[in-house]
């Protein structure tokens, strides 16, 4: 175990600490660290988040991550971290193959849990996690899955407008999530390209986000899907040494890609709305292009993650001469989360979604309520991903979502 650093357990007198232990320190570990480090400094929280311990298998690398991101101590075994008395919450930022084991152990040990998306690699794993979370809730524990795009103020505002009936009955939902970091066939075979670690490819990495976002905005789960998936490059250079999932050094050998590179599917909501989804890591020139549009009887909303401080809104009840999409700049104190940030017109970024995620989780713990999204929500997304894979394997046959 690394030597503890000096860290206050309260930025304000009288607030009890929420001592966080995090497993994983790469891309998502850095993002979650930012959230825990900042939430209590920006928002008036009922508990004070304390970065107690960070865990990873490489002692030197995890020590460097602790120094860089403000963690007080380190562990190289997540089991030892869970057993510590100075950990109240376990934050899981590892590849999907370890989510279930860590989360189940943490819940059994009486800890609160935050788990990165997708919740697990299989429906069976996700179901066991959701059941354990429900049982833990009866003991006063909280378990949340990290779909951070719910925490963009603009998407939270969109959800508010849909719930208020501003769009009327929904007819269409269109969602795309496009990246291009796998276009080069010489990109190495990192863990994100291995089914045994990642569970799926673009479907779980990107598709999980847009399935959750669509269901969150519409307010109901998908009923069924018809899907296509494809793996464009089936063999890649093997990496040398450790990988982050997004980068590595290549060796002379090659290995098999065992996940999808792209997924396309159409879907139905129980209310009758039709939806289309596209997730790919082969959209040349697109770095992180998540876009969603909802069309209803009375209006439409559109959101673009690359312009994440804006919503486009069309009100079909306006006079024809004045009709059309207009921009809503989501930076006002009345918008979700923004009363604690900057004056109107000063935008936020990707990293702020993790601050908002930490804020919401702290409130759920303090209030003893189920967080959103819950492990049950994560299980629902996992069922959609499984139905997409089943449909694609059966030549795109319409596949109902299991409940």
Feature locations, PLM:
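C-terminal glycine/acidic-rich active-site capping loop/insertion
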Residues: 2-9, 216, 234-260, 264, ...
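N-terminal Rossmann-like dinucleotide-binding module
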Residues: 2-69
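Glycine- and charged-residue-rich phosphate/anionic-cofactor binding loop of Rossmann-like
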Residues: 48-51, 363-381
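Short active-site oxyanion
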Residues: 49-53, 88-90, 201
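Conserved SAM-binding strand-loop segment of SAM-dependent methyltransferases
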Residues: 72-77
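Beta-strand-loop-alpha-helix segment that lines the small-molecule cofactor/substrate pocket
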Residues: 89, 95-150, 165
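Predominantly a Rossmann-like dinucleotide-binding segment in NAD(P)-dependent oxidoreductases
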Residues: 139-141, 149-257, 311, 395
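Glycine-rich phosphate/pyrophosphate-binding beta-alpha loops
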Residues: 208, 278-287, 346-350
